[in-house]
Curated annotation (Swiss-Prot):
Record text on subunit structure and interactions: Homodimer.
Organism: Aeromonas hydrophila subsp. hydrophila (strain ATCC 7966 / DSM 30187 / BCRC 13018 / CCUG 14551 / JCM 1027 / KCTC 2358 / NCIMB 9240 / NCTC 8049)
Phylogenetic placement of the source organism: Bacteria, Pseudomonadati, Pseudomonadota, Gammaproteobacteria, Aeromonadales
UniProt protein name: Erythronate-4-phosphate dehydrogenase
Coiled coil: none
Protein EC: 1.1.1.290
This protein's encoding gene: pdxB
Residues at the catalytic site: R211, E240, H257 (proton donor)
InterPro entries documented for this protein: D-isomer_2_OHA_DH_cat_dom, D-isomer_DH_NAD-bd, Erythronate-4-P_DHase, Erythronate-4-P_DHase_dimer, NAD(P)-bd_dom_sf, PdxB_dimer_sf
Keyword Protein transport assigned: no
Length: 376
């Protein structure tokens, strides 16, 4: 069995070698000729799995993406050809949640904000959106959920928990967690369009850790060059891997599509595909996820006080401070190929669950943020 994998997919060789030959290739440069003898194709979001890529792959019997989103895969074409397809829903939801939490705490300190007195709207209340919502609620924030497909499918009593898009946009902070879709009643391409951008109040915080095309980046640039700019946190960009460079200086925080890049998140995505292939071949998995992860540098802390916003910031940034990624991105802006290079060589980053908190102040609020808590 020949298994073609994105070269940047962590742990692919050690997990899939038991099935056959593992062939790592650059994700953005995969060609149909690379798949002529492939039985399994494993990709990330940078590879378009379409008719061109699948032009000559008679042996292909399994396609997987180690990502939550699947907009880069022609699922209809795979179904027509009878090729099973698997993704990794929720694999990096905790990582993205940690990213948003870290960003919120940076902005709160920078602009002297009391997050517990603010509202946050989650656009897209799926796996990732719900994770972000839960962390925001743990901070004491009032959370609004906007997810039209879920609202339509919900029972009447559950549908009441959702708000429409216009209501969501009135929140103090709006965080986007949707796939990119271009057609249908819930299309998300330029969901935040020029009209919506122009209507936003000055200083409103907007966060995008979903897909770059969900926001109209040119319209954002025009707004940011006005006398009433917004506060933007951007992990994703139109035109990746070539972001609109002129927009970057007008953001609060800017990063190269790495919100979901924790060690756990990346390993979990590969692991979910490994489990799927085991099921497909009716094999029992020989390896477990935890065995793939190194021992964290910081494993245990005993807080000396109750969890106020300042302590939460210290604990979160002990594990992940988004400002490091922001500084690296800005320093390398304009360097050819740097967007993908930063993703390929991303520093080791753990999720909040890698830190165990002990003692009388290791309470429920910290556990809801994602820490492992063992109160006395």
């Amino acid at each position: 069995m020949k298994i073609v994998v994105d070269e940047n997919m962590p742990h692919a060789r050690e997990l899939f070698a038991e099935f056959g030959e593992v062939i790592p290739l650059p994700g953005r440069q995969m060609l149909a000729t690379d798949l002529q003898e492939a039985d399994v194709l494993l990709v990330r979001s940078v590879t378009r799995v379409d008719a061109a890529l699948l032009a000559s792959c008679p042996r292909l019997s399994f396609v997987g993406t180690a990502t939550i989103g699947t907009d880069h895969v022609d699922k209809g074409l795979l179904a027509e050809r009878g090729i099973p397809f698997f993704s990794a829903p929720g694999c990096n939801k905790y990582s993205v949640g940690d990213y948003v939490l870290s960003a919120l705490l940076v902005l709160a300190e920078r602009h002297e904000l009391n997050l517990g007195a603010m509202s946050l709207a989650v656009i897209g209340a799926g796996n990732t959106g719900e994770c972000v919502a839960g962390k925001a609620e743990a901070l004491g924030m009032r959370v609004l959920r906007c997810d039209p497909p879920r609202a339509r499918a919900a029972e009447a009593n559950e549908a009441a928990q959702f708000v429409d898009y216009q209501q969501a946009l009135e929140a103090d902070i709006v965080s986007f967690h949707v796939p990119i879709t271009r057609q249908g009643p819930d299309a998300t391409f330029h969901l935040l369009d020029a009209a919506q951008i122009a209507a936003r109040p000055a200083g409103q915080i907007l966060i995008n850790a979903s897909r770059g095309e969900v926001w109209d980046n040119q319209a954002l640039l025009a707004r940011q060059q006005s006398q009433a700019p917004l506060r933007l946190v951007m992990d994703v960009w139109e035109g990746e891997p070539e972001p609109l460079q002129a927009l970057v200086p007008h953001t609060e925080l800017a990063t190269p599509h790495i919100a979901g890049y924790s060690l756990e998140g990346k390993a979990r995505g590969t692991w979910m595909l490994y489990e799927a292939l085991c099921r497909q071949l009716r094999r029992t998995p020989r390896q477990d996820l935890q065995s793939l992860l190194p021992i964290p540098e910081v494993r245990e802390v005993t807080p000396g006080q109750s969890a106020d916003q300042a302590l939460i910031k210290q604990l979160v940034h002990l594990i992940y401070d988004v400002r490091r990624d922001d500084a690296r991105f800005r320093n390398r802006l304009g360097v050819a190929g740097s967007f993908d290079e930063q993703r390929k060589h991303y520093p080791e980053r753990r999720e909040l669950s890698s830190l165990q908190l002990k003692g009388p102040f290791a309470g429920a609020a910290l556990a809801r943020l994602g820490f492992v808590c063992q109160p006395d």
